[in-house]
């Protein structure tokens, strides 16, 4: 799936749901308490982060989209901390504050990046559902997507009023569901349960086929536009009416903490859809975002630059013509998997059998082959007027179609030395009958410990000779 970064700055999203404060106490542990067999934590640092629906809004704002938030809090220090954090992040938060109840707080005691204890300060909110609905309806005209972030804490009490109000304005409704009754989300455009939540409703699924069948049945029963089941290390599955299931593998490189991963999925989905992305592309972006956030500790947001880098990395993982930035990310990923990078370069004006044989031999020197291609101006300087015969785009497209070639990139200079300094291949390969020291860029590669190898060329195979022969016959 080809992904691109949306224009998030043109994506207003309204989030409604259970806001909470995620509070972290960090400290050192060096002894066991004499009072009970538990570690003693000497608190050295504390931090507050928006959680629940507030984290969804924070993620949307971090992507550069416009985030509006409606939720319920107490009238206390925790609510003030939430409001200040959200304002600093650019979230337009509208809280219904209740004097008689505390803001929901999840306190986590941490030591050496490990969670030792979680303490919850909460009681279900008794909200004025009608007043909250009025607040939501007054904001719908300003947004392109509505998100219901439901943690079952009481902020959302009349889901259908909100869903129908949005549908009347043709505004998509995304819901992150909780509980044992998904009927309250009837008519939503998309719901995003995790596998455990999904199986609580439909029963255990023995395999993907059963998951798809039960999901399609649930969609029809509840008049849902689509269903996205997040499946942890197995990725996620998107179901739509009349379309085959779309299974996306997990993209996490390292997993430190799954806290807030569901928030990241629905926030990225909402922002992407509000920016005009089609649903499959939005799901692809959400999958990448989830892979990033589980590599962070605690409740965390991802930024637009982080997601853009992941998109570029995803594009770079595919074979073909790449820009330099995408190529460097692809190389980084390949090296993370222990792959050896081989580089060669040339004009490749008219591809012939000698080129193909040479590139196959070059590919055999490692795991990934990069071909650097002179752009049109540099070919003219090197080969003279009338060259190249084929433009750089055409030359790169042909090279990218060869099985031996992984990535193709162009360069504007007469030699690839500047490109070599950035790519830093493990092996530099050149065809010819000269010594290693005569290879352009050899000193650069050898200076950082790389290898330089010279391969023999196929006899009677020359682009210049082919061009001359064509001219003589023409």
Swiss-Prot record:
Its EC number is 2.7.1.167, 2.7.7.70. The active site is at 263. Residues 343-474 are annotated as: Cytidylyltransferase. Keywords: ATP-binding, Carbohydrate metabolism, Kinase, Multifunctional enzyme, Nucleotide-binding, Nucleotidyltransferase, Transferase. The keyword Membrane does not apply. It is an enzyme of class 2 (transferase). Signal peptide: none annotated. Residues 1-318 are annotated as: Ribokinase. It holds the Pfam family PfkB. GO terms for biological process: ADP-L-glycero-beta-D-manno-heptose biosynthetic process. GO terms for molecular function: ATP binding; heptose 7-phosphate kinase activity; heptose-1-phosphate adenylyltransferase activity; phosphotransferase activity, alcohol group as acceptor. It comes from the Bacteria. The keyword Heme does not apply. InterPro entries: Bifunc_HldE, Carboh/pur_kinase_PfkB_CS, Cyt_trans-like, PfkB_dom, RfaE_dom_I, RfaE_dom_II, Ribokinase-like, Rossmann-like_a/b/a_fold. Pathway: Nucleotide-sugar biosynthesis; ADP-L-glycero-beta-D-manno-heptose biosynthesis; ADP-L-glycero-beta-D-manno-heptose from D-glycero-beta-D-manno-heptose 7-phosphate: step 1/4; Nucleotide-sugar biosynthesis; ADP-L-glycero-beta-D-manno-heptose biosynthesis; ADP-L-glycero-beta-D-manno-heptose from D-glycero-beta-D-manno-heptose 7-phosphate: step 3/4. ATP binds at residues 194-197. Coiled coil: none annotated. GO terms for cellular component: cytosol. It catalyses: D-glycero-beta-D-manno-heptose 7-phosphate + ATP = D-glycero-beta-D-manno-heptose 1,7-bisphosphate + ADP + H(+); D-glycero-beta-D-manno-heptose 1-phosphate + ATP + H(+) = ADP-D-glycero-beta-D-manno-heptose + diphosphate. HAMAP family: HldE. Homodimer. In the N-terminal section; belongs to the carbohydrate kinase PfkB family. Catalyzes the ADP transfer from ATP to D-glycero-beta-D-manno-heptose 1-phosphate, yielding ADP-D-glycero-beta-D-manno-heptose. This is Bifunctional protein HldE. The lineage of its organism: Bacteria, Pseudomonadati, Pseudomonadota, Gammaproteobacteria, Pseudomonadales.
């Amino acid at each position: 799936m080809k992904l691109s970064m949306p224009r998030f700055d043109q994506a207003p999203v309204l989030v409604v749901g259970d806001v909470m404060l995620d509070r972290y106490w960090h400290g050192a542990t060096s002894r066991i308490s004499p009072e009970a067999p538990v570690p003693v934590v000497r608190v050295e640092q504390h931090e507050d982060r928006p959680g629940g629906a507030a984290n969804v809004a924070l993620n949307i704002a971090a992507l550069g989209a416009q985030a509006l938030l409606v939720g319920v809090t107490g009238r206390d220090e925790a609510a003030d901390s939430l409001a200040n954090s959200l304002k600093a992040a650019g979230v337009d938060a509208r809280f219904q504050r209740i004097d008689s109840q505390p803001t929901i707080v999840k306190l986590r005691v941490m030591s050496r990046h490990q969670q030792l204890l979680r303490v919850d300060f909460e009681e279900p909110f008794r909200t004025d559902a009608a007043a909250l609905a009025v607040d939501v309806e007054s904001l719908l005209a300003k947004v392109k997507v509505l998100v219901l972030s439901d943690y079952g804490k009481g902020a959302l009490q009349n889901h259908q009023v909100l869903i129908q109000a949005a549908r009347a304005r043709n505004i998509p409704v995304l819901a992150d569901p909780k509980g044992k009754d998904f009927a309250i989300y009837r008519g939503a455009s998309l719901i995003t349960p995790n596998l455990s939540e999904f199986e609580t409703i439909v029963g255990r699924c023995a395999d993907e086929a059963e998951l798809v069948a039960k999901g399609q049945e649930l969609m029809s029963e509840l008049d849902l536009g689509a269903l996205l089941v997040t499946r942890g290390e197995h990725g996620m599955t998107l179901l739509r009416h009349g379309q085959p299931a779309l299974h996306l593998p997990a993209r996490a490189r390292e997993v430190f903490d799954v806290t807030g991963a569901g928030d990241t999925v629905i926030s990225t989905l909402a922002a992407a859809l509000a920016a005009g992305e089609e649903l499959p592309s939005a799901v692809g972006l959400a999958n990448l975002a989830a892979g990033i956030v589980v590599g962070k500790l605690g409740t965390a947001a991802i930024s637009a630059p982080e997601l853009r880098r992941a998109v570029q990395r995803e594009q770079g993982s595919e074979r073909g013509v790449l820009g330099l930035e995408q190529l460097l990310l692809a190389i980084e990923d390949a090296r993370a998997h222990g792959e050896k990078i081989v580089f060669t370069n040339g004009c490749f004006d008219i591809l012939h059998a000698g080129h193909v044989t040479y590139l196959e031999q070059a590919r055999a020197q490692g795991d990934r082959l990069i071909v650097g291609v002179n752009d049109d101006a540099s070919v003219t300087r090197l080969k003279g007027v009338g060259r190249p015969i084929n433009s750089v785009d055409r030359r790169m497209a042909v090279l990218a179609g060869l099985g031996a070639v992984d990535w193709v990139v162009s360069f504007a200079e007469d030699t690839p030395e500047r490109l070599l300094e950035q790519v830093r291949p493990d092996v530099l390969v050149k065809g010819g009958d000269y010594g290693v020291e005569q290879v352009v860029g050899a000193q650069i590669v050898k200076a950082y410990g790389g290898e330089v190898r010279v391969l023999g060329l196929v006899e009677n195979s020359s682009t210049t000779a082919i061009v001359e022969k064509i001219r003589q016959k023409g």
